[in-house]
């Protein structure tokens, strides 16, 4: 399996991708570097596919990866519930391609190429 190391150890990389995946599901749009966005795309697409499957095993697989964060304070809905209830139903007819990456300019501090990744 090909992947990017992103300058981190495997545990740090997995933790960062879990955080970014959870944030993208909650906010549906985040700004990050291009390489992180490209790596995040494959993880998020797999999570949405699990959400579309919707069975108990898929829910447990997604729960093992997604952080336990509150997505909506009024309804007390967490990120996993939002994935299965809102996001997965939105893409019921679509076969992949749930995210869009738009390139931005370089970051001011270090010149890293930035991008916005969002759910379509």
Swiss-Prot record:
Q: Which Gene3D superfamilies match?
A: Ribosomal protein L17 (3.90.1030.10)
Signal sequence extent? none
In Gene Ontology terms, what is a biological process of this protein?
Answer: translation
Return the PROSITE patterns for the record.
Answer: RIBOSOMAL_L17 (PS01167)
Statement: the UniProt record of this protein carries the keyword Ribosomal protein: yes
Family statement: Belongs to the bacterial ribosomal protein bL17 family.
The protein's name: Large ribosomal subunit protein bL17
Its source organism is Bacillus pumilus (strain SAFR-032)
Instruction: List the taxonomic lineage.
Output: Bacteria, Bacillati, Bacillota, Bacilli, Bacillales
Q: Which gene encodes it?
A: rplQ
